[in-house]
Amino acid sequence: MRNGVRGIGGLEAERLQACIPLAVDCSRTRLYGCGCSGVSGLLRRMVLSASRGRAIALGNHIFLPDRHDGDLAILAHELTHCGQYQAWGPVRYFARGALEQLRHLFYRKLGLGSNPYHYHAKAGRPFTSYGMEQQAQMVEDSFRSRQQGQVIPSA
């Protein structure tokens, strides 16, 4: 760990990767959480301010607000975005991400369209056919409900 920035590895990575139906190279990810200092801390504060205090993944960099420290379901959601970034590349990832956030803004502020995080899981429908935020929300929900035996569709 350097200046509060750390990688995701060991048992944590195994547990998270087990619930994400996308390939994610955790060794390429960096987590900016509680305890970030120096330039990393400044970067974390700026990103979290711009995201209105919401957890966010920018490429392979995950920024978590203090209230989500230790919340593996939120981390699984954001790690899903890292997997999307790794699979799609930066142009497609950031273009789709910007579009999803605009859709969410229109839905939240104006009541237009549908919530890009909301999904209806259908048997036989592949995981990759869902939207960017739907995929991440499915992983988060699945992680939270694993004790009840619910699973998400395979890739």
In which residue ranges do the predicted regions lie?
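Short pre-active-site segment immediately N-terminal to the catalytic Zn-binding motif
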Residues: V47-A76, Q86, G124-T128
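A short, surface-exposed helix-loop junction/capping segment
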Residues: M1-R2
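Catalytic Zn2+-binding segment of zinc metalloproteases
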Residues: R67, L79-A98
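Short, solvent-exposed loop/turn segments at secondary-structure junctions
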Residues: C34-G38, I62, D69-G70, T80, ...
